[in-house]
């Protein structure tokens, strides 16, 4: 006979077993319920077309989705998930005395949301989408390949610029919105890949970690130590980082004996004077400083400095002095072309190549200029479709230019069959060149502008191709009438023809794809009017396509001219997510 206690023990054992099973089932049910809640809330953000009527705010992202975009959001969800956003919405509601907006609610500019840091870190459309998606769903989705992968087929996409920049943008947005768990997650991810990050990209991470401050102290300390021990020069650091961080780097390098107390790692005063002259866009002052004989352009690494920090016009003027070795290396082993590949400015790259820069030269770690450019370019920018007549992305254009330069097979000979057929007819040659370049400006605006700037077309007199009509007053002094009879070649005609011819030659050399398209149009034996009446379906389609492109370009130019006069060119292009300091 079993003791009485055995029955009690068995009863408790059976009860415990049942409760464990029930507890497991309850846990599974809870997980499933949370998953459904996550999916349902995420759908409100991921499917704006279905939930637009519920959205009561929108966040405007400059440059998002290719040309700027708004993300529809719901203030109640964001306020519940982010203390920072709750404060933003509360202040705006109080200021508006409880009034609401119409047609999707109030509109918030992302840069205003990010405060002062938004001027230094450009948080992209996809990075903000990931942060907002996390606020809705509580889960981190897959990183978007178009924004996180570079176009170098040999890259592991762990520490390349697109991957690092994307994580840094998410980290900064999450920290600003006070989303602690997402901030910690992306801080850990960056810490895990720091050893694989190229030294130039460390500045980007250091800048973001410094802005995040206390929420990213581990990342800040480790990144700061790596920059201190790196071969990054003080000029580059000074242009990229705030003064308080520069002081920490100088103090650390002094304590480690990496720099001398006399110059603290900065170049001597003669070199600094040349750099300041370049910052002032004063190449004539640079020439005067060189006559003092204290230094030269190569010792001052003036071309490197101009390419990295100055307007493209200054680089061109400096090259025209013909006083610097265009293939000179800086202490880190970078040629001027390597720096230009990081800058990603097509005009600068073409200017260097036309002056003899060697695209096959490699850095100390074995990278050519084209590979540097590829490691900086996002797949979304490179493989994205560009609408005809719209500017090509600069990143893609730089890669195409460098690849073409490596092939060393520019198309030779006349611009096309039509120009060769013009023979000795100077008027015909001028008309051809003017028409070809004008068509290139419409169909391939970015490529045409690069070639025209280097050929200095803007410094010549534009031909009046009209039928005797007087040009507008503002253009009378900048046009030359080709309809004069008899036509006599003048000095201004020759200058214009030389510049236009060089434009076409540069197009042949660096933009063969575009040149082939122009060849097919310009070499058509039939004029456009008869082409429009042609019964051939293919030719009629080609005519109408061309007509649409020209008409669209005309209307866009007219609208732009109505809005404003001349547009000024931008000065310096930032590398990555961090805006350069001046």
Swiss-Prot record:
TM regions (residue ranges)? none
Record flagged with keyword Zinc-finger: yes
Induction pattern: By mechanical wounding, treatment with jasmonic acid (JA), salicylic acid (SA) and benzothiadiazole (BTH), and in response to infestation by the rice striped stem borer Chilo suppressalis and rice leaf folder Cnaphalocrocis medinalis.
A GO MF annotation of the entry reads: transcription coregulator activity
Q: Where are the annotated segments for Salicylic acid-binding core (SBC)?
A: 391-526
Q: Which residues are listed for Zn(2+) binding in this entry? A: 150, 155, 157, 160
Chain sites annotated for binding salicylate: 436
PROSITE patterns noted in UniProt: ANK_REP_REGION, ANK_REPEAT, BTB, ZF_C2HC_NPR
Keyword entries, A-Z: ANK repeat, Cytoplasm, Disulfide bond, Metal-binding, Nucleus, Plant defense, Repeat, Ubl conjugation pathway, Zinc, Zinc-finger
Q: Which cellular components does GO assign to this protein? A: cytoplasm; nuclear body; nucleus; RNA polymerase II transcription regulator complex
Q: What is the first-listed, main subcellular location in coarse terms?
A: cytoplasm
Q: Where is the composition biased (Basic and acidic residues)?
A: 553-563
Biased composition of type Polar residues is found at: 1-18
Mapped ANK repeat ranges: 229-258, 269-299, 301-328, 332-361
> What is said about the domains?
The BTB/POZ domain mediates the interaction with some component of ubiquitin ligase complexes.
Family, according to the entry, reads as follows:
Belongs to the plant 'ANKYRIN-BTB/POZ' family. 'NPR1-like' subfamily.
Q: How does it assemble?
A: Oligomer in an uninduced state; disulfide-linked. Forms activated monomer upon changes in cellular redox potential. Interacts with TGA2.1, TGA2.2, TGA2.3, LG2, TGAL1 and TGAL4. Interacts with NRR, RH1, RH2 and RH3.
Q: What name is this protein filed under?
A: BTB/POZ domain and ankyrin repeat-containing protein NPR1
Naturally occurring in which organism (per UniProt): Oryza sativa subsp. japonica
Q: What is the lineage of its organism?
A: Eukaryota, Viridiplantae, Streptophyta, Embryophyta, Tracheophyta
